[in-house]
């Protein structure tokens, strides 16, 4: 029944809206949830769906930060316009590693790592990394506390960290936030740049998935279009809340709690995978 499929779409949109911005892996969570709750659709659509619904989350970022990211915003001084263009240049530079590395390898990683065990391992490994890095940085003052002071070189290396998220379970936001902190930025700068970098990255990735879907000879029927729209709209609404939560959270807290969550979830998934294999 279509109504059941739409309810599932709403649920997946909620998962996407929350996990896209928290450093816990949205694609990984969607793949895991679909182990238990699946859309009654073909595999090609589901694989495309998992990526394309990110567009709703991206539009939420664009809405929240529209004035900050718009160089043509009325009332901006010449200096503010210059800084906005510089920010966009940093974002473009940070996209280069993904274009050169992640895009060509995407199909290979999709074929070999989109399974529960690799996702569980990635959750645990990056969970440990979050805890360890936060512990190492506890007594250190960040060198970069303002995006305007972040160098183009730092932006490029943050983009290199983003490439790590090609492995499901890693988390794009988690990889870039970790990388930014390692490179000396404050948590606030790390989170903000992660949000901004998501715009071209996820628009591009979603576009590639959609184009590949159609080039492979697939098409969308009315029900599938509706499922995509409902899931994306839900992801948009939930993302508005998740982004505001994270921007306030990082001002007073570190990311240790997310590291612990990743380790617990990854461990449970390994146990589940073991029993599923045995029994």
From Swiss-Prot:
Superkingdom of origin: Bacteria
Keyword Heme annotated: no
InterPro entries reported for this sequence = UppP
Alphabetical UniProt keywords: Antibiotic resistance, Cell membrane, Cell shape, Cell wall biogenesis/degradation, Hydrolase, Membrane, Peptidoglycan synthesis, Transmembrane, Transmembrane helix
What EC number(s) does this enzyme carry?
A: 3.6.1.27
Cite a single GO BP annotation: response to antibiotic
Q: What class of enzyme is it?
A: hydrolase
Protein name, UniProt field? Undecaprenyl-diphosphatase
What's the name of its gene? uppP
